[in-house]
Amino acid sequence: MTDLRTAPVPGLRADDHVRGADDAPLVLFYGDLACPACALAHERLRSAPVRVVFRHFALKAKHPRALALAHAAEAAAAQGAFWKLCDGVYADQGRLDDPHLWARCEALGLDLERFDADRRGPAAAARVRRDVTDALRAGATGTPTVWIGPGGAELLDTMVTFGIREARRIGPPTDGWARKGSTYEH
């Protein structure tokens, strides 16, 4: 019989992209730099009092620029600019093509020749492939995928709990939302 359980979420690695206080709660974020939902999650996590670990879950079938942007982020990381590049890409989802990417890298002061060689090199491809493989093995099915804490508690339960709490805080819907049984439709 085949074991269909997912593998555990890999723990923190020395080469992970990490931002936030060492003593803050750990959030593992598998994201796609071309994903608008990831951009929203990125902005929310950026302002939260958490320690974020970013790993690539580049879904080229859904976002054609996903792999190119993931490789670019790794090339920027080689020059100490991973988070700056990600922040810029997520803040401007309408400009993901190469001319805008190059302008962004130039504005960050990156060595453009090195950046180009690194983004096309085997290290960036291997890193992105490892992250994507780990995400799939751990059960990720889309982006963004977020796990909380070292045990890798999947965020779905947390999102549902948060959604219920926020719905209670906000109150009944207004502005065109109509109640249909126990749900609301717009």
Where are these regions (language model features)?
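Intrinsically disordered, low-complexity sequence elements enriched in Ser/Thr/Gly/Pro
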Residues: 3, 17, 53, 166-167, ...
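A short beta-strand-turn-helix
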Residues: 7-26
